[in-house]
Curated annotation (Swiss-Prot):
GO terms for cellular component: cytoplasm. This is Chaperonin GroEL. Forms a cylinder of 14 subunits composed of two heptameric rings stacked back-to-back. Interacts with the co-chaperonin GroES. ATP binds at residues 29-32, 86-90, 413, 494. InterPro entries: Chaperonin_Cpn60_CS, Cpn60/GroEL, Cpn60/GroEL/TCP-1, GroEL-like_apical_dom_sf, GROEL-like_equatorial_sf, TCP-1-like_intermed_sf. Keywords: ATP-binding, Chaperone, Cytoplasm, Isomerase, Nucleotide-binding. It comes from the Bacteria. Together with its co-chaperonin GroES, plays an essential role in assisting protein folding. The GroEL-GroES system forms a nano-cage that allows encapsulation of the non-native substrate proteins and provides a physical environment optimized to promote and accelerate protein folding. It catalyses: ATP + H2O + a folded polypeptide = ADP + phosphate + an unfolded polypeptide. Pfam families: Cpn60_TCP1. The gene is groEL. One of its GO terms (molecular function) is isomerase activity.
Length: 541
């Protein structure tokens, strides 16, 4: 495929044009008075959103050179979203400001490599200042405020705070679309896994089609049970004690399943069998989790244990078990606390070592089931368009809250960047030449988020920036009420992690783009013309 190449200022101008087209679209959403953007979809209704990364991902430009610039800024939003889960619009606005300011200096003859060095020093200085301003999140109220600022909705903030309080830091909160118009929070206590009863005959409540076992014994094995003789010794002990039994096995089939069902229906004993959750090595680990949670053992030939030798003291115990068609919940397992804590520590260590996103997600789920719990927020709305938009806001709020718990909070509304810029201004005085200009690019860019928040509120950004800069750390501008307040006291908070990540990622992409000297793009080739069809059939009358 043929290539088109542009050099120097022409190349950078084309990239800058693409950057501006994408950033100008995204930045209209910043702040409490930011607007929404409507995205056309190839199928279904258009999507209305104010989520920076969703808007950025949807933008493709016709001009190949401009599109490359847009894709680079898209990288800023995506990277910030991956690291912090929020702050994508802020990162885009910062990157645009750095690129625009940097381009002016390159045109004036600055050396891009030395500029980059100055930008890096100034960013490190600002990040240090942000860390110094950060305050630990204390209590449910602050969590609710962080979530409310991110989602732009106090009700959402309260719901996320409730969910965080219920499941703790190790818990998992999932967001789903509701079948109703109401947004609801469901908490699943205990360990839940997505396997239900093997046979509907095992249900104890035929109306709800579920089986509830109080204080059952739990047989955990990775084997397939097809011969009743294998589990007969332990079944006899269960019958004599009059206890209930939950069997978790790879499968229960044939004669064994028939015998269990017949005896259940006769009332000989109360038993429910479910298939083991997960697959392969993950299944072995999940069975071990269940065993530790319930104080039982995994009956496995790998461990030298046979089903026929199983005794009641090898079985797990729980306060109650609820089994439905497609999931099982074990509540209040009777495992030793120190064993559960050791298992939690082991999973946390694995979480830190793994690089796979999929593995991280699965380990986090296991951790939640053992230590925290699982909360499900079901987002409801009148229309599908509104529901999708609400779901994106809810996800942002949740990510912002997690980031806040991790690294603390700083004053919101772009004010943290203005206060950090005071430290950067001191650094600028110690630098010289193009390195100084590079630091000044960051100094100017730090004003951009607050400037655009004010602009979207119909106010003059420069005046507000100067007023905030002159005030003490923590003071900022509440664009919704149009007044200067202590942002921490007013509950206008940003997670320090989001603030830091947005700046670092913006600098990374902007400084790389400014060092570009040539750009190579594919030349679009026209599709070959269709061969002409025969006009007629020669020789025919």
């Amino acid at each position: 495929m043929a290539k088109e190449i542009k050099y120097g200022i022409e190349a950078r101008k084309a990239l800058e044009e693409g950057v501006n087209k994408l950033a100008n679209t995204v930045r209209v959403t910043i702040g409490p008075k930011g607007r929404n953007v409507v995205l056309d979809k190839s199928y279904g209704a258009p999507l209305i959103t104010n989520d920076g990364v969703t808007i950025a991902k949807d933008i493709e430009l016709e001009d190949a050179f401009e599109n490359m610039g847009a894709q680079l800024v898209k990288e800023v939003a995506a990277k910030t979203n991956d690291v912090a889960g929020d702050g994508t619009t802020t990162a885009t606005v910062l990157a645009q400001a750095m690129i625009n300011e940097g381009m002016k200096n390159l045109a004036a003859g600055a050396n891009p490599i030395v500029l980059r060095k100055g930008m890096k020093k100034a960013t490190d200085c600002a990040v240090e200042a942000i860390a110094g301003m950060s305050e630990k999140v204390t209590g449910k109220d602050q969590i609710a405020k962080v979530a409310a600022i991110s989602a732009g909705d106090e009700e959402v903030g309260q719901m996320v705070a409730d969910a965080m309080e219920k499941v703790s830091n190790d818990g998992v909160i999932t967001i789903e679309e509701s079948k109703t118009m109401k947004t609801e929070l469901d908490l699943v206590e205990g360990m839940q896994f997505d396997r239900g009863y093997i046979s509907a005959y095992m249900a104890t409540d035929m109306d709800k089609m579920e089986a509830v076992l109080d204080n059952p014994y739990i047989l955990i094995t990775d084997k397939k049970i097809s011969n009743i003789q294998e589990i007969l010794p332990v079944l006899e002990q269960i019958v004599q004690s009059g206890a209930k039994l939950l069997i978790i096995a790879e499968d229960v089939e044939g004669e064994a399943l028939t015998t269990l069902i017949v005896n259940k229906l006769r009332g000989t004993f109360n038993v429910v069998a479910v298939k083991a959750p997960g697959y392969g090595d993950r299944r072995k680990e999940m069975l071990k989790d269940i065993a530790i949670l319930t104080g039982g053992q995994v009956i496995s030939e790998e461990l030298g244990l046979e089903l026929k030798d199983t005794t009641m003291d090898m079985l797990g115990r729980a306060k109650s078990v609820k089994v439905q068609k497609e999931n099982t919940v074990i509540v209040d397992g009777e495992g030793a606390k120190e064993d559960i804590d050791a298992r939690v520590a082991q999973i946390k260590a694995q979480l830190e070592e793994t690089t796979s996103e999929f593995d991280k997600e699965k380990l986090q789920e296991r951790l939640a089931k053992l230590a925290g719990g699982v909360a499900v927020i079901r987002v409801g709305a009148a229309t599908e368009t509104e529901m999708k938009e609400a779901k994106l806001r809810m996800e942002d709020a949740l990510n912002a809250t997690r980031a806040a718990v991790e690294e603390g909070v700083v004053s919101g509304g772009g004010s943290a960047y203005i206060h950090a810029s005071k430290k950067v201004a001191e650094l600028v005085k110690t630098l010289s030449g193009d390195e100084k200009i590079g630091a000044q690019i960051i100094l100017k860019a730090l004003e951009a988020p607050l400037f655009h928040i004010a602009y979207n509120a119909g106010l003059e950004g420069a005046v507000i920036i100067n007023k905030v800069r002159e005030s003490e750390v923590g003071t900022g501008f509440d664009a919704y009420k149009e007044e200067y307040v202590n942002m921490i006291d007013a509950g206008i908070l940003d997670p320090a992690k989001v603030t830091r990540s947005a700046l670092q990622n913006a600098t990374s992409v902007a400084s790389t783009l400014l060092t570009t000297e040539s750009v190579v793009a594919n030349i679009k080739e026209d599709a070959p013309a269709m061969p002409a069809g025969g006009a007629g059939m020669g020789g025919m009358m």
